[in-house]
Amino acid sequence: MANIAVICDREFFQPFDQRVYKEVLTLKRAGHEVEIITPHNSNLIKEIEGISVHCVTTKGPPVSTAYRLIKKAIAKDYDVYYCHELDPLLYSFILKWMKNKPIIWDCHEYLVPMKKELQGNLSAMFTDIGIKIAAPRVDHIITVDNLLGRQLAKLNKVTVVPNYPTVNDFPVLEKTLESKKPNFLYVGG
């Protein structure tokens, strides 16, 4: 089976990234060796359910965190690089050039509109350019919904994998409460 590096663009532990965790457990159950590489407040290796989590410090200028993530990713001979979100997508240029291994990009956000709303037009424009240049160069894209999947399919091959909470995320009530009030359901990761 494959030896997979999952590269995160934000802290995996605080807050705990349930989406990445579910994906990693699924890959592990399928027989793959999986390790997570993530920004963190210090350099260390943690283990969670037999999965190594390589933490690299975020101290220093932002570019130094990217450098450390890439350095950690190329230090081992992984079979596949699984990049979460925008920054690791951009790192994939270097990973592909240095290691020539398959790159999977997991995009679960509408990045351009989000950047526009949170950081303005210039950030949205650079994000759009970065995606249009980098996404066609990865080996595959995974996303969470059909609309985003159709948008990204213009750039590369896409697989849509919906991200719903597991049944274990909800407590089981011993008895059912009867109520005339409506029930609301939340579907999300």
Predicted regions and their residues:
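Conserved donor-binding/catalytic core segment of Leloir-type glycosyltransferases
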Residues: 4-5, 142, 176-189
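A short, glycine/small-residue-rich beta-strand->loop->alpha-helix junction that serves as a flexible
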Residues: 6-22, 83
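Conserved donor-binding loops in enzymes that form glycosidic bonds
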Residues: 9-10, 163, 186-189
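Membrane-proximal helix-turn-helix segments that form the acceptor-binding/catalytic region
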Residues: 25, 29, 67-74, 90, ...
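A short beta-strand-loop structural module common to alpha/beta enzyme folds
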Residues: 34-41
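A short, charged, and often flexible helix/loop element on the N-terminal side
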Residues: 49-73, 118-123
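Short, solvent-exposed amphipathic helices
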Residues: 84-90
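Carbohydrate-associated surface elements
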Residues: 147, 164
